[in-house]
């Protein structure tokens, strides 16, 4: 996999009006404890169900012989705000450590911690770098974040953080977040970005508070699916360009924008199994190709119908048309059974590969059964008991001390043992009867 965007916890210290998720907000007392406990409870299973190796083959950088280099992927850890108390100590640091340990002997992983930046301190930067974080990405450089309105405030904020980062030996990333290979720089590095009008997220997704506040300026021409953080290439997990989004409850989505239904859960299934179960499913092949308007062709939705379904009305009552709306409606109306079928396929596959533990058998009964089975076989000097794997003495296996004697009648092919110093003459009469 090249990239995963992992939202670890819903808690945030801000409630920005342009945010794409209503659940990113301040929580207090019991509510805060509840969302932190959810993150704590789920992250071990989520990490366990990530790919065994976090690498990908880069088709954009072939070797002279036509083969493709294997490169290390990245996982972006986000919130909410990933560095507030108590999320930082109880969730973020532990997730970073779990990822480091999981991939240490498997080619590694580039860990990016995304933050608003205003909670950063020298001690926190030190803690992150000590745990092997490759990049700290500050994602608040825009007019929507209270206190950072305007170029002057934004510059002062970036200058302050840059000085802090550089005190710890970090350097500023020379590549933007939209550059395909930005994660190939040697770390540790830091970066800044925000929802500015000229950025890749500047028009804002039709989601969350951005939608409720009428802030999304996207039109039908803005295909969020066919770009980074969209669904483009999400099924091609072994190649460059692959990315999915994961939420605190383990839900997996093909894009950061989030489809109306998750494609699976990491609390149930391995990520690669989830993706493989959707390979060849027309709707999800359309998403991975960056053409959501073709999602419904196999279900009677023409491209014209999909585009018509992409028209809606904003909460303020104005017309709005974007392919994300059509995708939402297609998921709601059609894809529920399709996703359930994929889930059932995964369940059946697990049942075939999960070993069944044999029922417990007491030791004496096990020896007795073994002796009975062996006593019905022709004597072979080199044979072994099929249960205990011990060598036969030429006729039958001897039971362990304390085993119940066999009461079976030898078959016609069974040869009676001849007394010898090492043979069954030492057994009791009842054992050889």
What are these regions (language model features)?
Residues 1-110, 122-123, 131:
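Conserved alpha-helical substructure of the radical SAM core
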Residues 7, 76-80, 112-116, 137-139, ...:
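A cross-family glycoside hydrolase active-site/sugar-binding cleft signature
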Residues 12, 16-19, 237, 250, ...:
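Short cysteine clusters
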Residues 22, 263-378:
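Flexible mid-to-C-terminal extensions adjoining Fe-S/redox cofactors in radical SAM and related proteins
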Residues 85-240:
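Conserved AdoMet/S-adenosylmethionine-binding subsite of the radical SAM
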Residues 166-226, 251, 257-314:
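C-terminal accessory region of radical SAM enzymes
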Residues 372-414, 430:
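Extreme N-terminal, non-catalytic leader segments
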Residues 419:
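Hydrophobic positions on the alpha1 helix immediately C-terminal to the Walker A/P-loop
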């Amino acid at each position: 996999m090249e990239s995963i965007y992992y939202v670890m916890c819903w808690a945030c210290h801000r409630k920005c009006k342009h945010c794409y998720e209503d659940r990113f907000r301040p929580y207090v007392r019991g509510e805060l404890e509840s969302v932190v406990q959810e993150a704590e409870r789920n992250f071990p299973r989520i990490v366990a169900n990530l790919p065994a190796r976090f690498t990908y083959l880069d088709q954009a950088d072939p070797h002279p012989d036509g083969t493709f280099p294997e490169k290390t992927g990245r996982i972006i850890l986000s919130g909410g705000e990933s560095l507030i108390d108590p999320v930082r100590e109880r969730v973020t640091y532990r997730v970073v450590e779990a990822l480091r340990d999981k991939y240490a002997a498997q080619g590694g992983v580039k860990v990016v911690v995304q933050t608003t930046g205003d909670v950063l301190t020298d001690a926190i930067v030190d803690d992150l770098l000590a745990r092997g974080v490759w990049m700290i990405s500050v994602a608040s450089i825009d007019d929507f974040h209270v206190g950072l309105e305007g170029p002057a405030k934004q510059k002062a904020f970036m200058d302050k953080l840059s000085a802090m980062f550089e005190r710890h030996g970090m350097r500023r990333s020379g590549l933007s977040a939209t550059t395909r290979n930005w994660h190939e720089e040697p770390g540790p590095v830091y970066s800044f970005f925000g929802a500015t009008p000229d950025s890749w997220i500047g028009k804002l997704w039709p989601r969350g508070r951005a939608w409720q506040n009428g802030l999304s300026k996207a039109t039908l021409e803005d295909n969020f699916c066919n770009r980074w953080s969209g669904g483009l290439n999400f099924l091609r997990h072994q190649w460059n360009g692959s990315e999915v989004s994961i939420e605190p409850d383990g839900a997996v989505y093909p894009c950061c924008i989030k489809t109306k239904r998750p494609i699976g859960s990491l609390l149930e299934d391995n990520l690669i199994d989830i993706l493989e179960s959707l390979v060849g499913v027309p709707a999800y092949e359309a998403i991975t190709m960056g053409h959501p308007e073709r999602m419904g062709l196999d279900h009677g939705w023409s491209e014209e119908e999909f585009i018509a379904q992409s028209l809606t009305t904003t909460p303020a009552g104005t017309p709005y048309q974007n392919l994300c709306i059509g995708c939402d409606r297609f998921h709601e109306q059609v894809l529920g059974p399709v996703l359930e079928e994929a889930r059932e396929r995964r369940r059946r596959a697990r049942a075939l590969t999960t070993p069944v533990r044999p029922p417990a058998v007491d030791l004496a009964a096990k020896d007795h059964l073994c002796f009975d089975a062996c006593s019905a076989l022709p004597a072979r000097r080199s044979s072994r008991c099929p249960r205990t794997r011990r060598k036969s003495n030429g006729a039958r296996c001897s039971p362990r001390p304390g085993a119940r004697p066999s009461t079976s009648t030898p078959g016609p092919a069974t040869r009676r043992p001849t007394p010898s110093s090492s043979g069954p003459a030492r057994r009791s009469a009842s054992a050889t009867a």
